[in-house]
């Protein structure tokens, strides 16, 4: 009996070593998911092509009524439908100063709608909604970097306008007096500032602020 036991010891050692190797590999696979699992995780958190191209209601696209639709999938489908299948990339983007002006006007005049602000800043109401919804605020270093970037952008645009011979837009300075706003001056680069000039943009601004106070 003992002779057969000792004779089988090498096989038992090999079997135990194999089990340890299997358990170690299983732990490694548990700690570091494979590329296939990572791709599967990303796919499960994204919308499929069939879901994006389907014209059926959102509630029937996932689970077919047998399970609840995840909230993230509802939001993605609704946004995809709202943008007509295109990515959010507006042609006109407001500068940081203009975005701050949008927030300031909305804070001071809560009754002012996104459509009113969109008409004045010549952007879509969706752009205004996203600006008001955003909570991110740049720190001091990021603000300096953005200012330098916009300064370089302004220099580049001036050079392009000078080369093409186009007339740059007029610069309008707005001053606040309590809860009222007024156009302080209208300047054209290369000319002296002119105060008290009634321009279409000035009239639109006063009309916009007057309508919000009603």
UniProtKB/Swiss-Prot annotation:
<dbReference type="GO" id="GO:0005739">
    <property type="term" value="C:mitochondrion"/>
</dbReference>
<keyword id="KW-0496">Mitochondrion</keyword>
<dbReference type="GO" id="GO:0005634">
    <property type="term" value="C:nucleus"/>
</dbReference>
<dbReference type="InterPro" id="IPR010487">
    <property type="entry name" value="NGRN/Rrg9"/>
</dbReference>
<comment type="function">
    <text>Required for respiratory activity and maintenance and expression of the mitochondrial genome.</text>
</comment>
<dbReference type="Pfam" id="PF06413">
    <property type="entry name" value="Neugrin"/>
</dbReference>
<feature type="compositionally biased region" description="Basic residues">
    <location>
        <begin position="204"/>
        <end position="214"/>
    </location>
</feature>
<feature type="region of interest" description="Disordered">
    <location>
        <begin position="184"/>
        <end position="214"/>
    </location>
</feature>
<feature type="transit peptide" description="Mitochondrion">
    <location>
        <begin position="1"/>
        <end position="30"/>
    </location>
</feature>
<keyword id="KW-0809">Transit peptide</keyword>
<comment type="similarity">
    <text>Belongs to the RRG9 family.</text>
</comment>
<protein>
    <recommendedName>
        <fullName>Required for respiratory growth protein 9, mitochondrial</fullName>
    </recommendedName>
</protein>
